[in-house]
């Protein structure tokens, strides 16, 4: 937001953004209202909440009766988030807890929120493997449309689809584990990813591929992660 704001202020004509940002609460709503939903709680990403705050989550927690715990990204942060979520489930509670107070406030970052409101506007967004979720994305507002690469370079018609064998959408919704997908670790690896959850190093499939906590697929059997696979995920040099 600040980059395109500065580009407009400076009158730059060689700067463009291809915006694909998403909003978390509408995605949670879509997951929780699906008939096959199995999700019992959420760990809310601390870096998102450091900007957006936590005010959007209490209504979701109450409506769907699930705990929402804001966490950081260090191992202890994540473990603490899981611990707090499990304790809520054990007590039959469903509320928002902030386990990342060193970075997250309820009101978020007011200056950043004002910038977001000026530069972006909310739109419906297609999620790979899931489909279209209303009000779940952002695009540049009319005032900044000249910097929108989708508008400027006429790429709106470009569409990509995941192969039928890829079950990343089900992984994203918590319906299956990565190792339940027949492509996992065979045709789908971090070097040859088929879906969003393997493309990103933060994705569930990429994490399973690296740490290999399950052994119920041919690719997962064995005594550990081969050195070649470790090098794929952790390149040196």
What residue spans do the PLM features occupy?
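Extended hydrophobic packing segments that form well-structured cores
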Residues: 152-222, 231-237
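Solvent-exposed alpha-helices and their adjacent loops that cap or buttress functional pockets
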Residues: 7-12, 31-41, 59-63, 158-160, ...
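Fold-independent oxyanion-binding glycine-rich loops
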Residues: 3, 20-22, 45-48, 72-73, ...
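A conserved active-site cap/scaffold subdomain adjacent to cofactor or substrate pockets
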Residues: 18, 38-101
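Predominant activation on well-ordered alpha-helical scaffold segments within soluble catalytic domains
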Residues: 1-5, 28-29, 54-61, 76-87, ...
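Phosphate/pyrophosphate-binding betaalpha-module
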Residues: 1-56
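Internal helical hairpin/lid segments
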Residues: 80-170
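Detector for the Zn2+-coordinating histidines of canonical Cys2His2
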Residues: 227
């Amino acid at each position: 937001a600040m980059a395109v704001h500065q580009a407009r202020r400076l009158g730059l004509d060689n700067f463009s953004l291809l915006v694909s940002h998403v909003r978390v609460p509408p995605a949670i709503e879509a997951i929780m209202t699906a008939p096959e939903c199995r999700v019992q709680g959420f760990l809310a990403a601390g870096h998102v909440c450091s900007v957006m705050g936590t005010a959007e989550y209490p209504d979701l927690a109450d409506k769907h009766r699930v705990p929402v715990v804001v966490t950081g990204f260090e191992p202890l942060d994540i473990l603490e988030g899981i611990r707090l979520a499990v304790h809520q489930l054990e007590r039959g509670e469903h509320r928002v807890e902030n386990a990342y107070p060193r970075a997250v406030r309820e009101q978020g970052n007011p200056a950043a929120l004002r910038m977001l409101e000026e530069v972006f506007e909310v739109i419906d967004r297609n999620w790979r493997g899931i489909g279209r979720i209303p009000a779940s994305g952002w695009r540049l507002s009319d005032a900044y449309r000249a910097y929108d690469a989708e508008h400027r370079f006429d790429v709106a018609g470009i569409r990509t689809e995941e192969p039928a064998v890829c079950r990343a959408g089900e992984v994203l919704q918590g319906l299956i584990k990565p190792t339940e997908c027949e492509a996992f670790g065979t045709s789908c690896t971090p070097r040859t990813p088929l879906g969003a959850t393997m493309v990103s190093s933060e994705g569930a499939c990429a994490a399973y591929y690296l740490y290999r906590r399950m052994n119920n697929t041919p690719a997962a059997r064995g005594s550990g992660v081969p050195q070649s696979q470790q090098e794929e995920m952790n390149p040196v040099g």
